[in-house]
């Protein structure tokens, strides 16, 4: 059990070293309410990050901080009163269906998947749509297809994950198609049980 937990932690550390893990935003204060406008212009309540680590650009560098009050960030021993316009960043999350897929892959396939995704100029944090049949289906079928779409400012890619884990199954097949016409297929014949 300990070995499995260590491998899981190494995977998470690998994922969270990616630069694309960051969502950048600007603090807005409207009628005493603290809001965050992200880089795409979406607005969210700062309260939604109440229990998440955030970083503020303070004195020329990024420093970890946390909300002490609605309009006050605790940054080390210093309290920063927010007035609007402050730059922050916080970690994006990986969509649950995509994380379930990643968790189900053996180490070799996991690394190959990340390398493939990076070759398209994308990251797991660029996943904007995910449908994992194993997560959303009540059936225990050992075969099916799941769908994922990745997008950022410079690249878009759709990925289909075909799988067959039955006794005569072929394992996993990942079909990638990018908006620039690049296509790729990645196979794995590793047989594994469903988790």
UniProtKB/Swiss-Prot annotation:
InterPro entries: DUF2777. This is Uncharacterized protein YisN. The lineage of its organism: Bacteria, Bacillati, Bacillota, Bacilli, Bacillales.
